[in-house]
Structure formats: C-alpha cells, structure tokens
Amino acid sequence: MAPGGNRGWLLRLVIAFSFAQGAVSMARPAVSYRALALGADERAVGVIAGVYALLPLFAAVPLGRRTDHGRCAPLLPAGVALISGGCALSGLAGSLGAMAVWSGVMGLGHLCFVIGAQSLVARQSAPHEQDRNFGHFTIGASLGQLVGPIAAGALIGGADRAHSSALALLVAGAGCAVALSSLWRIESRTAAGSRKAPGDRVPVRRILRARGVPAGIFVSLSVLSATDILTAYLPVVGEHRGIAPSVIGVLLSLRAAATIACRLVLTPLLRLLGRTALLTVTCLLGALLCAGIALPAPVWALAAMLTALGFCLGVGQPLSMTTVVQAAPDGARSTALALRLTGNRLGQVAAPASAGLVAGVAGVAAPFVMLGALLLVSAGTALRSPARPSGETEDGGPRQGPEAVLRRKSGI
C-alpha cells in the first residue's frame, strides 16, 4: 500500500486500538484496587505498576528490528492475545507476586500491539500526513482511556473490592479480544517488500545520535509517565481522600476526553504555534497542573485540573512519534519507534517505583510533584528539539522543492 493512499486501514486500526487500550486502561486501576484488597501498600502498588513495563523493556528493540525487515501486522493479534490473557489471569491471581507476573504479560502484549501499529502508520503515511495520522491513531488510545476507567469504576465498588476488581479484569480481557475483528488484512502483503535486508540494519547508536530522536524519546517518556502514574495513583489518592472509585473513574475519563479533544484540533494548533512551541508550552502547563493535583483540592477543582492536564498531555505522544520517525535513518524507523517505546517503558518502570518510594516517605500526593518536575525538564528538552524535520514546514505540511520530493519518495 503506497503512503498517502486510502485510509480505511487507519480507521480500522483506530477501532482496534480503542478496544486494546480500553482493556489496558480498565485493567490498570483494577489491578491497583485488587492489589490494595490483597493487602498491598503504596510501595507494592508502585512495584506492580512497574512490572507492567519490565518485560517490554527488553523486548522493544528486537521487535522493532523484526518489523523494520518484515511485516507489521502479525504483531497486532499477538499483542491482543497477550493483553487479553494478562488481564484475565490477573483477575484470577490470588497473590501479589502472581499479579505482578500477569501485569508484565499485559505490558508485553501492549508493546507488541503498539510497535506493530505505530510502524504501520509510519510505513503507510506520507511524510506530510504523519502528524495528522499519528494524531488520529492516538485518538484510539484516548478513546480507550476514556471508556476503560469508567467501566472499571462502574464494576469496582462495595465492600468486596477483591471480587469486584477481579470481575473488572475478566471483563477487560474479554473486551480486548474484540479488537481482533478489525485486524483482518490491515496491511498489504506487498508493503514489506521494500524493507531492507537484515544485514543492512542501522546501529542503535547511530539512531540515538540522530538529531531529534533523543528529544522525542524524552518528551514521550515524560508524558507517558505522567499518564501512567495518574492511572495507577489516582485510585490511591481517592482512597486517602474518601473519593469513590466511580468518581475516580469519571475523573480519569475526563482527562482522556480532553486528550481526544486536543488531538482533534492538533493540526490547527500546529499551524498556529508550530511543533516546538506547542510541545514546550503544553509540557510546561502540564508540569504546573501535575503539581496542582498534589494539593488537597475539592473534587470539582481536581476535575478541572485533570481536564486541562489531559489536553496538555494529548500533544506529546503523536508529535514525539512524528519527530522520531522523521529524524530516524531510512530503514530504521520501526527500530527508532521501538527505542522510543523502550524509553517509555524505562519511564514506566522507574516512575511508578520512584512514585511508590516518594509516596511512602512524603505521602500519596507527592508523586504528582515529581511528575511536575519531570514535565518541566521535558519542556526544556522540547525547546531544544529541531524546529522542523527535513522535508516539511513548521506546520507539518510538505516543503516544496527537490528535497521534499526526495523525502516523499523514500517510502515511510
């Protein structure tokens, strides 16, 4: 399938991603509630949240290498199967150790799906379409993040949190399996024909030294860490402040709804501010809002802050994908995306574990101050990133001239 062709595949990918991400977003708070019901403290919740990213940490680059030299589509059903199994088995687990293991399986499945899906978008989109198509692709994640917490909050309640959280995890596993219905022939078999041979692979060091790749990785790490800790620790904050699980689910879904709204207007925002300014401003505002969540605010103020924060966090993921893809050497874009996901998983391992330690020492609201500091650093990193990748204008459109023509013919 040539880049810039029919986008029916993108709609089906968004639908599949909505179900897969919805299952994960439903399972993550359910895992936290089930762990608390089984006797976990704040530190244990942080460790279990970190294990979710541990297996993917070692698998990301090999999967990216494989995708650079082959097809993207096989990773998608494999990811769905692992997510479904991880959710269901987490619900059946009777110990914190078993929950941690199945949480890791769930994370590995999510990694497989995301590497395959992001590589598919990069490969089947023309350069000037990538900001838009990655933005639309991440709407699938936002839809899942919108529905998942509400569903979890509706199912988790009452005195028997262990039983209700287990039910939520089983429902999440079943819901994820629905994603398989949208994945049939989503990638043309001829799309992988132009991939480089395995012997031609680009060294990881060269990819990481490409201007724009480190900045894209760090911004993505910061934004995802913020989203991840919000999902894992807002239930803990709710327990300490007396906020019901159903309300916590609504608060998390407000954040996701704001992220969807952001991505729907991403193209006009890029035209107005440009990629560098937009990333910098949203990371800076996100830092202030994360710190604000640590304050003992009423529920309505918490809802307002989470809505604004969701809008700010909606910018980082799609723009960091485009930054990394367009900065990476030819023939190594899937590996570059995998390195970006490795950075994400490093953040998902280190941030929850650090949050657990900080919460144990300074209280359950302290991790949000830590997130604010991380987003503040990412704002500085975004400010120093390239204003525009080769072959495109600041608003994401194609630059006219021989360089742009060559760029479009390179085959994403």
Describe the residue ranges of each PLM region.
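Helix-loop boundary and gating motifs at the non-cytosolic
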Residues: N6-A53, A215, V219, S225-V237, ...
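Cytoplasmic helix-loop-helix junction between adjacent transmembrane helices
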Residues: G104-A141
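Residue-level signature of mid-helix packing/kink "hotspots" within the transmembrane helices
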Residues: A53-V61, L146, A256-I260, L264, ...
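Structural signature of the two symmetry-related core transmembrane helices
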Residues: P74-A88, A277-A291
